[in-house]
């Protein structure tokens, strides 16, 4: 059993939004962030003075599009040359360049310096935010977490997500697949209804990724039969279509192109995202953006039918993986008991209709919250792994599968599969190979994942060499190759020459794109440094606010007629002068250090407090002397101002 202080959390690290849950009081609590939202934008922004994560980052994106990073999940574990990365770069306002080993690196300006971050580092910042949200709620530090990934994530994407966890200072107990996590939420929701074995299809369409998994659930055993999907299809692709549509409309109406105006595009994208959501519940909506480009106001309407038409190819594409999982699981669609919707994009009526038509009019299951189901399942798995949960969850068993076939290259560039796709993990497969030529001193083991017959069409995961094979005719040496997948879906491969006893192995961690231990350690240190800087900024803001509050509250106090009568003219002028000087100083020194603000506060208190206490002693108001607390609580006419961001 884990000790009480070792509470583990479940994090749904999403493309556009993330969510965190924890098992407590015999159920899962989905934890709201400091803004009261139960999901947090997966956004990180860098400014001249600070780093922002979550809602704060997304709220200022229109003012700072080049330095606000999102969609790190669409980059993680991919190469810069990947066609999907190249097409995404066209839509992103931030700059992505090719780093060492073709790793995509995100370039931003932070504190007036150019900085490069890997997708793992950006994701780790979002994970730190989710960790802090949980810590604020639980009132203690959190070390352990279960983090989810799309079921269709390949080996390098899983490994990179695990690295992001390490950089954030979390101990990632397990990486689990999002649809499987959602199935746990569904299974617990339906726990009372004991109806033997059920075939359940999880349809998970989020902001940037799409998964379909088919499971059988029986008495707390969740067995994934097949999984399919697209790690590059989601709500953002529907937003992109809307943005392109309105850019063309603006060009047509006003003969001007906004494609080069990053701020205008961002404001348009925000409006498109809002319009898309509105169209899930109404048949038509309008987009109104003041002064979008060169002072021109933009006003347009969009109907649900038009939105559906411009995305119909993508919507139809969502049905292909559904057919694929049924085929792989050798099931007819009539034997699916429940179709469960997960992910915000499943709220789109057309997608629901296509899915319902596919299943011959079957009612879809909407009983679980599509935004929170994945974090819910991850929190349950975290409780199981730390021995936290009650009997209700401790007897759950998850049997997941490898999403892609794994094998190695044999003579002639042929893909020889050792572990076929949809094999239950963890698993281990061994096969004996031999040499291709006489007296061959070594063999090159090249490990691939994918479904094609030729290795050149599949994804190379890694290579290693087995040397020191004694001279022998071709086909004589016995080389035993072992593929071993752990519970996170990460692969270890070893090869051994049985006769000579030579052995070599590799953990497939995509040598080219993978971060080394040293790099991860350096990133951990960087993360701590950034966190310390964030703390410093927070302290500065607090110190500045205390000073401002005190000054404005003092001003209000001496404006109160009842109290002002008790002050001599000289004292009143003395306080007014001190307050005016302080406010002027604040306006000219917004970026001053904490101790400067604190010094100014002491200085101002030194002038005001003696006068105020003298005033109260001279037969003051019945309440006695107000403390600093009373001053700072009244909010003041001035105080820190907030500004609406479009």
From Swiss-Prot:
Its main location: cytoplasm. GO terms for cellular component: cytosol; plant-type cell wall. Pfam families: HSP70. It is found in: Cytoplasm. Induction: By heat shock. Up-regulated by virus infection. Transmembrane segments: none annotated. One of its GO terms (molecular function) is ATP-dependent protein folding chaperone. Belongs to the heat shock protein 70 (TC 1.A.33) family. DnaK subfamily. This is Heat shock 70 kDa protein 5. The gene is HSP70-5.
């Amino acid at each position: 059993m884990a000790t009480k202080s070792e509470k583990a959390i479940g994090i749904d690290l999403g493309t556009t939004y993330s969510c965190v849950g924890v098992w407590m009081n015999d159920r899962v609590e989905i934890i709201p962030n400091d803004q009261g939202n139960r999901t947090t934008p997966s956004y990180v922004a860098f400014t001249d003075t600070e780093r922002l994560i979550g809602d704060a980052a997304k709220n200022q994106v229109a003012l700072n599009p080049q330095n606000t990073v999102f969609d790190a999940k669409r980059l993680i574990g991919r190469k810069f040359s990947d066609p999907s990365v190249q097409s995404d770069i066209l839509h992103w306002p931030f700059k992505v360049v090719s780093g060492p080993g073709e790793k995509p690196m995100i370039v931003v300006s932070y504190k007036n310096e150019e900085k490069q971050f890997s997708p793992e580092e950006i994701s780790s910042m979002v994970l730190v935010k989710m960790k802090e949200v949980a810590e604020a709620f639980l009132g203690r530090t959190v070390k352990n977490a279960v983090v989810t990934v799309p079921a269709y994530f390949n080996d390098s994407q899983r490994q990179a997500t695990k690295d992001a966890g390490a950089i954030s200072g979390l101990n990632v107990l397990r990486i689990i697949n999002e649809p499987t996590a959602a199935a746990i939420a569904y299974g617990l929701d339906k726990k009372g209804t004991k109806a033997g074995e059920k075939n359940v299809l999880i349809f998970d369409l989020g902001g940037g990724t799409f998964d379909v998994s088919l499971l059988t659930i029986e008495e707390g055993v969740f067995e994934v039969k097949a999984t399919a999907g697209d790690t590059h299809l989601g709500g953002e692709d529907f937003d992109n279509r809307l943005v392109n549509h309105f850019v063309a409309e603006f060009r047509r109406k006003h003969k001007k192109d906004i494609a080069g105006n990053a701020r205008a595009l961002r404001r348009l994208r925000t409006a498109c995202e809002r319009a898309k959501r509105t169209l899930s519940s109404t048949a038509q909506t309008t987009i109104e953006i003041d002064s979008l480009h060169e002072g021109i106001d933009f006003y347009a309407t969009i109907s649900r039918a038009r939105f559906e038409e411009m995305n119909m190819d993508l919507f139809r594409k969502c049905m292909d993986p559904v057919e694929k999982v049924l085929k792989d699981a050798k099931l007819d669609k009539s034997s699916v008991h429940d179709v469960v919707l997960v992910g915000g994009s499943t709220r789109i009526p057309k997608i629901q209709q296509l899915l319902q038509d596919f299943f011959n009019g079957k009612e879809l299951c909407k009983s679980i919250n599509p935004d929170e189901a994945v974090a819910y399942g991850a929190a349950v798995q975290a409780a199981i792994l730390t021995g936290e949960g009650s009997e209700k969850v401790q007897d759950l068993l998850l049997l997941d599968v490898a999403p892609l076939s794994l094998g190695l290259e044999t003579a002639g560039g042929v893909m020889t599969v050792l572990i076929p796709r949809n094999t239950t993990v963890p698993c281990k497969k061994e096969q004996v190979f031999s040499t291709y030529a006489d007296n061959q001193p070594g063999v090159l083991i090249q490990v691939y994942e994918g479904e094609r017959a030729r290795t050149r069409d599949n994804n190379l995961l890694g290579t290693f060499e087995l040397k020191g094979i004694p001279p022998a005719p071709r086909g004589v040496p016995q080389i035993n190759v072992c593929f071993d997948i752990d519970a996170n879906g990460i692969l270890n491969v070893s090869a051994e020459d049985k006769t000579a006893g030579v052995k070599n192995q590799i953990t497939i961690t995509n040598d080219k794109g993978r971060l080394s231990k040293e790099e991860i350690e350096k990133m951990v240190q960087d993360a701590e440094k950034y966190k310390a800087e964030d703390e410093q900024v927070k302290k500065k803001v607090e110190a500045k606010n205390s000073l401002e509050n005190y000054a404005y509250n003092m001003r209000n106090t001496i404006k109160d007629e009842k109290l002002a009568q008790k002050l001599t003219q000289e004292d009143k002028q003395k306080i007014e002068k001190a307050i005016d000087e302080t406010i002027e100083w604040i306006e000219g020194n917004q970026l001053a250090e904490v101790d400067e603000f604190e010094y100014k506060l002491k200085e101002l208190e030194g002038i005001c407090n003696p006068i105020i206490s003298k005033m109260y002693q001279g037969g003051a108001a019945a309440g006695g002397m107000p403390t600093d607390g009373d001053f700072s609580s009244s909010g003041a006419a001035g105080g820190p101002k907030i500004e609406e961001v479009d």
